[in-house]
């Protein structure tokens, strides 16, 4: 289960971060097409370090035991 704080690998081939590892920032439950926002250490050509992905475009590498306050 992908949740906030999880380490994920990107499977989307056209993405700048294809096969890179990022950290899940948020997971939207409202039913949108790309509900998972992933944050990366390196920036793309535009200076952006986050992107939205569908759940099926991600593979969870490590689960973080993040607990909201």
UniProtKB/Swiss-Prot annotation:
Any single Gene Ontology cellular-component annotation: chloroplast thylakoid membrane
Keyword Plastid: yes
Keywords on record: Chloroplast, Membrane, Photosynthesis, Photosystem I, Plastid, Thylakoid
An individual GO BP term: photosynthesis
Membrane topology designation: Peripheral membrane protein
Compartments where found: Plastid, Chloroplast thylakoid membrane
InterPro entries attached to this UniProt entry: Elect_transpt_acc-like_dom_sf (IPR008990), PSI_PsaE (IPR003375)
Pfam families membership: PSI_PsaE
Function field: Stabilizes the interaction between PsaC and the PSI core, assists the docking of the ferredoxin to PSI and interacts with ferredoxin-NADP oxidoreductase.
Annotated family: Belongs to the PsaE family.
The protein's name in its UniProt record: Photosystem I reaction center subunit IV
């Amino acid at each position: 289960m992908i949740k906030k704080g999880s380490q994920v690998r990107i499977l989307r081939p056209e993405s700048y971060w294809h096969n890179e590892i990022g950290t899940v920032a948020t997971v939207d439950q409202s039913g949108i097409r790309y509900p998972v926002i992933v944050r990366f250490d390196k920036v793309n050509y535009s200076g952006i370090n986050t992107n939205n992905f569908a759940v099926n475009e991600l593979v969870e590498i490590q689960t973080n035991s993040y607990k909201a306050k």
